[in-house]
From Swiss-Prot:
Ubiquitous. The gene is PPP5C. Residues 495-499 are annotated as: Required for autoinhibition. It catalyses: O-phospho-L-seryl-[protein] + H2O = L-seryl-[protein] + phosphate; O-phospho-L-threonyl-[protein] + H2O = L-threonyl-[protein] + phosphate. Autoinhibited. In the autoinhibited state, the TPR domain interacts with the catalytic region and prevents substrate access to the catalytic pocket. Allosterically activated by various polyunsaturated fatty acids, free long-chain fatty-acids and long-chain fatty acyl-CoA esters, arachidonic acid being the most effective activator. HSP90A and probably RAC1, GNA12 and GNA13 can also release the autoinhibition by the TPR repeat. Activation by RAC1, GNA12 and GNA13 is synergistic with the one produced by fatty acids binding. Inhibited by okadaic acid. One of its GO terms (cellular component) is proximal dendrite. This is Serine/threonine-protein phosphatase 5. Residues 1-23 are annotated as: Disordered.
């Protein structure tokens, strides 16, 4: 489902008819050793590069594919990881790590039944392996939970969580000394107090959290799927990319660029939650500002504002740990109302993922998307959340295993058809925090520095001025945060080293 930046490494080639010569075998092993060293140093792009070179010399070695599959997993190239794991198994049906890798890939893609089949294979081969048993049991639990959720979803009369809440009867205990909404309303003083409260690692009272969620659902549900914003010549707006639960880096954005206000508007381009372990703090801060400045603070949906992602990458677990399962269900409802795209002055289109698997999509098609749902596996809604640019023309299979990759010609044609200048998207880590591709027509912005405490990347945000709309990039680096590791609330399989 997600991806990494950098040069695209080609998918595995089919084995040659003739076995490689001894010299080629030796060189392939040397390349594998180099790749392993890069992998240990967390330089996954170079690891992929050298595993690929080893595969070119000896395409019949299952281990090379298994190793490259793991490197793809680490860079969130789940589609490529799945292909390599499957090839490894085809080459050697006894290669157990291949089944682990394929299960991990399918888990990341939300294909839990397929993952369960591979974990089942591992358990049969290694019946006394505690790790294998634990992963099988955890995956089986998810499969059963999903089946239960589908059964409930089949009830057309399913009620909103809001209908079962009695917020007025919730009492705020005398010993609670934290921020409270003023007459049920978010104010700037509340927001300042909230951010300091969160900075001190304290929890907002559940009544206040529910008040924010109920109110922001009402606000978001009235918005169009495509938000259209007009900037006057003297006005500017700040566009931020993924924040992924990195609350202390979010505070740093506001420190560097100023707090949101009617004269300092923001757009946050999805993926507010998951991975980082302060996702609750990030999202309630963002929702608070949305309530305070509904016309000047904009939130677009990312692929991680979805149930499948939240179940695996930590947000669901974090909400349940800090609050309740019921509150997570309400978050899920709210996420479904987040707009999918925003257009500035009719010239700059912003979305989380990218462009479309098919030609001919118009802005009016985006407006007509019924977004109040979990995203489908294909189609325009899926593409807006999931697709990625590629340097070559045309389209190709997604490295993530979802949606597609689109080339410069696709971008140019879409912009010309819709009378746009360029697109801004997020969704991918970039070493410098941003990237300008497709001849300036496709801009990526990523706002989570040192992503997951391990990527070492810079982050950035963009200023757009109404007078010319040219992107002005502002880079920043990570700031310290409390000793809570990323993925602390992620699915147990991840914590068990699924990837």
């Amino acid at each position: 489902m997600a991806m990494a930046e950098g040069e695209r490494t080609e998918c595995a080639e089919p084995p040659r008819d003739e076995p490689p010569a001894d010299g080629a075998l030796k060189r392939a092993e040397e390349l594998k050793t180099q790749a392993n060293d890069y992998f240990k140093a967390k330089d996954y792009e170079n690891a992929i590069k050298f595993y690929s070179q080893a595969i070119e010399l000896n395409p019949s070695n299952a281990i090379y594919y298994g190793n490259r599959s793991l490197a793809y997993l680490r860079t969130e190239c789940y589609g490529y990881a799945l292909g390599d794991a499957t090839r490894a198994i085809e080459l050697d049906k006894k290669y157990i790590k291949g089944y682990y890798r394929r299960a991990a890939s399918n888990m990341a893609l939300g294909k839990f039944r397929a993952a369960l089949r591979d974990y089942e294979t591992v358990v049969k081969v290694k019946p006394h392996d505690k790790d294998a048993k634990m992963k099988y049991q955890e995956c089986n639990k998810i499969v059963k939970q999903k089946a239960f959720e589908r059964a409930i979803a089949g009830d057309e009369h399913k009620r909103s969580v809001v209908d079962s809440l009695d917020i007025e009867s919730m009492t705020i205990e005398d010993e609670y000394s934290g921020p409270k909404l003023e007459d049920g309303k978010v104010t700037i003083s509340f927001m300042k107090e909230l951010m300091q409260w969160y900075k001190d690692q304290k929890k907002l009272h559940r009544k206040c959290a529910y008040q924010i969620l109920v109110q922001v659902k009402e606000v978001l549900s009235k918005l169009s799927t495509l938000v259209e914003t007009t900037l006057k010549e003297t006005e500017k707006i700040t566009v931020c990319g993924d924040t992924h639960g990195q609350f202390y880096d979010l505070l740093n954005i506001f420190e560097l660029n100023g707090l949101p206000s009617e004269t300092n508007p923001y757009i946050f381009n999805g993926d507010f939650v998951d991975r980082g372990s302060f996702s609750v703090e990030v999202i309630l801060t963002l929702f608070g500002f949305k309530l305070l400045y509904p016309d000047h603070f904009h939130l677009l949906r990312g692929n991680h504002e979805t149930d499948n992602m939240n179940q695996i990458y930590g947000f669901e677990g974090e909400v349940k740990a800090k609050y309740t399962a019921q509150m997570y269900e309400l978050f899920s409802e709210v996420f479904e109302w987040l707009p999918l795209a925003q257009c500035i002055n009719g010239k700059v289109l912003i979305m989380h993922g990218g462009l479309f698997s098919e030609d001919g999509v118009t802005l009016d098609d985006i407006r007509k998307i019924e977004r109040n749902r979990q995203p489908p596996d294909s189609g325009p809604m899926c593409d807006l959340l999931w697709s990625d640019p590629q340097p070559q023309n045309g389209r190709s299979i997604s490295k993530r295993g979802v949606s597609c990759q689109f080339g410069p010609d696709v971008t140019k044609a879409f912009l010309e058809e819709n009378n746009l200048d360029y697109i801004i998207r997020s969704h991918e880590v970039k070493a410098e925090g941003y990237e300008v591709a497709h001849g300036g027509r496709c801009v990526t912005v990523f706002s989570a520095p040192n992503y997951c405490d391990q990527m070492g990347n810079k982050a950035s945000y963009i200023h757009l001025q109404g007078s010319d709309l040219r992107p002005q990039f502002h880079q920043f680096t990570a700031v310290p945060h409390p000793n809570v590791k990323p993925m602390a609330y992620a699915n147990t399989l991840l914590q068990l080293g699924m990837m």
